[in-house]
């Protein structure tokens, strides 16, 4: 790899152009920079300091960055679309009518507040009418069909070892606060106290007798579930998450919970093969179910129902949920406006119907063509990087090339749109009843895939989502329409900025196919070992250097980044930068672009990358994300990543002694 860069670096080191005559729209806003900071000292602050000053943290956010600015714009667009649709009186039964009905019900605060917790009553009555654990198993099955996540979760997706078929998977779930550490670590005592107070409040709003006792019972069950739950780091071990068995074996493996009755109640036929993601969790969960008094289990199930419903009921419920989950846990000081909450539901439940309208109005076909050109250039550059690796032998390289060549690329929007005709929305029912019906439809829709081949035309993300993904079991990379706009992509901006922004995003997702998890899958999306023992050890050794680099970062006083939890994302960041930079340099064909606003093309590449991660963030969110998120914080996705690239040092004349400099022997670039 180093030899490849050496062939490229001299080309731009000789560039000394200074005029601005290329006719391109500037992709860098000079007002976003903070020139009082040297790029040699803190490149993130230099590239984003002006933007950070102009975009203070909004009270409805714990973190506000360029992603959020674009997401806000999209929400405003969608809200205008929904409002316009309502004025046109859409046809009964149409997707437009379903979207409008859901939006209007969510906006009707008068009705929601008048109903209070009444929409929940029949569901809670069903819980408290349960007379024995056999009946509770049946109720859990019914609630899972309605989209609830009490005790554990189920879903249908590709078999990790045979991606040609889809199987049922069972995974840990059922924790209201989300992460096991909140229940078990001493440092989170205040969170536990706040959660108990919240549960007691919503139990009281729901008319439950002795709400404090019910809250304590529910919390006790959740704590025991937390004790047997896997950590976030354990859940990154893909191989450990694959434990196939038949449905008939479940009762023997996990006595205490009647899975035979559960499957019959859900009308799921006997399965010769399914996957249990966390064996030890299910052993603990089934033991807990058998050994816990029925009344405690009922309070737990009731708590899950109320908690999952609280954001969609009256203002009293929503306020209680906001005060705990947003204000206490994330430091957010202001609720999102109702229209944002309202449009989020149809945007989620009928995502592709919304996406179809969004694409027609806001996504030019020319953008798809330009992005595909960038993708193809990155694919070529990635192949060159594989060829240049001095730590990988030819047999492993051949498998890597085969996987790269077999990538499925999805850009903008699906070729086949999802059919929502079977989804029924009835405004005469409560908003909550409609959400349950919609969730039931989603679960049933997922279950129809059981035993069938994966539909490769399906998308795992809607076109209006500001994000991108790589799926290892389909070996596909996907870039929705919403992310293909400034600051990520601008068809009129110079290539340097586009390669630094959307190019790195594309390279990031490509590299996920070869990170510490993605590398375990072959070109067809099957989990299989295509690495020689020596190459496997070489990869792990390089990855360990990266772990230590990020472990050394102090995020807050006494709190360090978790280099192992974020390893996959950090590998992808590094790969994205490395591959996109090579693709950009290749695209120049030896030519030297003229400088724009005094910045060389190489400098603009790195500025384009850094600007993607500009953000304001409070300390509560920094701590939460550092401990729970597999992504590094924005500042570290810039400074920590770029310190590994000689091309970055050359672009900004960074040398030994400068704070941004990292000695060559401490750097690592895997791809």
What are the functions of these language-model segments?
Residues 1-5:
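Positively charged n-region of N-terminal signal peptides that target proteins for export
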Residues 38-41, 46-111:
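Active-site-surrounding "flap" and adjacent substrate/cofactor-binding loops of secreted or lumenal enzymes
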Residues 60-82, 211-228, 498-504, 597, ...:
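Short secondary-structure subsegments characteristic of cysteine-rich extracellular domains
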Residues 224, 253-257, 275, 279, ...:
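Intrinsically disordered, low-complexity linker/terminal regions across diverse proteins
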């Amino acid at each position: 790899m180093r030899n490849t860069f050496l062939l490229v670096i001299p080309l731009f080191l000789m560039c000394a152009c200074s005029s601005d005559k290329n006719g391109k729209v500037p992709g860098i806003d000079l007002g976003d920079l903070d020139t009082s900071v040297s790029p040699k000292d803190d490149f993130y602050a230099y590239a984003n300091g002006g933007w950070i000053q102009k975009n203070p943290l909004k009270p409805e956010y714990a973190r506000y960055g360029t992603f959020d600015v674009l997401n806000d714009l999209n929400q405003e667009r969608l809200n205008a679309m929904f409002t316009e649709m309502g004025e046109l009186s859409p046809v009964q039964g149409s997707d437009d009518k379903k979207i409008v009905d859901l939006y209007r019900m969510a906006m009707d605060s008068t009705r929601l507040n008048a109903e209070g917790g009444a929409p929940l009553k029949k569901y809670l009555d069903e819980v408290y009418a349960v007379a024995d654990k056999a009946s509770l198993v049946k109720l859990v099955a019914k609630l899972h069909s309605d989209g609830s996540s009490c005790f554990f979760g189920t879903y249908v997706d590709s078999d990790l070892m045979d991606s040609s078929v889809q199987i049922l998977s069972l995974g840990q779930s059922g924790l209201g606060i989300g992460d096991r550490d909140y229940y078990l670590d001493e440092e989170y005592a205040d969170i536990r106290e706040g959660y108990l107070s919240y549960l007691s409040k919503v139990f009281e709003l729901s008319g439950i007798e002795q709400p404090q006792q019910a809250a304590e019972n529910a919390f006790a069950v959740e704590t025991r579930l937390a004790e047997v739950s896997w950590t976030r780091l354990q859940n990154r071990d893909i191989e450990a998450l694959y434990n196939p068995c038949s449905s008939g074996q479940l009762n023997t493996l996990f006595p205490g919970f009647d899975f035979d009755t559960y499957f019959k109640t859900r009308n799921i036929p006997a399965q010769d093969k399914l996957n249990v993601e966390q064996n030890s969790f299910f052993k603990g969960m089934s033991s807990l179910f058998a050994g816990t008094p029925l009344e405690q289990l009922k309070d737990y199930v009731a708590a899950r129902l109320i908690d999952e419903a609280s954001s969609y009921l009256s203002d009293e419920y929503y306020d209680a949920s906001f005060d705990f989950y947003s204000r206490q846990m994330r430091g957010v000081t202001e609720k999102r406006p109702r229209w944002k909450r309202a449009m989020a539901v149809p945007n989620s439940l009928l995502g592709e119907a919304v996406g179809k309208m969004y694409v027609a109005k806001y996504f030019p076909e020319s953008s798809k063509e330009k992005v595909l050109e960038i993708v193809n250039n990155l694919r070529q550059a990635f192949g060159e990087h594989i060829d240049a690796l001095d730590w990988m032998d030819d047999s492993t390289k051949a498998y890597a090339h085969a996987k790269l060549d077999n990538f499925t690329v999805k850009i903008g929007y699906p070729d086949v749109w999802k059919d929502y005709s079977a989804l029924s929305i009835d405004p005469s029912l409560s908003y909550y009843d409609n959400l349950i019906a919609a969730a039931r439809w989603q679960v049933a829709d997922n279950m129809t895939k059981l035993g069938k081949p994966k539909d490769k035309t399906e998308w795992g993300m809607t076109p209006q989502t500001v994000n991108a993904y790589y799926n290892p079991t389909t070996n596909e990379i996907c870039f929705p329409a919403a992310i293909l706009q400034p600051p990520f992509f601008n068809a009129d901006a110079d290539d340097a900025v586009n390669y630094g922004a959307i190019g790195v995003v594309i390279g990031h997702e490509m590299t996920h196919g070869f990170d510490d998890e993605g590398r375990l899958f072959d070109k067809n999306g099957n989990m299989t070992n295509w690495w020689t023992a020596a190459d496997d050890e070489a990869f792990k050794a390089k990855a360990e250097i990266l772990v230590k680099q990020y472990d050394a970062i102090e995020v807050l006083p006494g709190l360090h980044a978790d280099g192992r939890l974020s390893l996959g994302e950090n590998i992808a960041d590094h790969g994205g930068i490395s591959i996109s930079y090579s693709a950009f340099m290749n695209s120049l064909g030896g030519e030297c672009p003229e400088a724009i606003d005094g910045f060389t093309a190489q400098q603009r590449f790195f500025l384009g990358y850094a600007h993607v991660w500009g953000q304001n963030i409070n300390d509560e969110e920094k701590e939460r994300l550092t401990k729970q998120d597999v992504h590094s914080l924005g500042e570290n996705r810039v400074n920590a990543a770029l310190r590994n690239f000689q091309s970055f040092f050359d672009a900004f004349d960074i040398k030994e002694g400068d704070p941004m400099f990292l000695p060559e022997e401490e750097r690592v670039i895997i791809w």
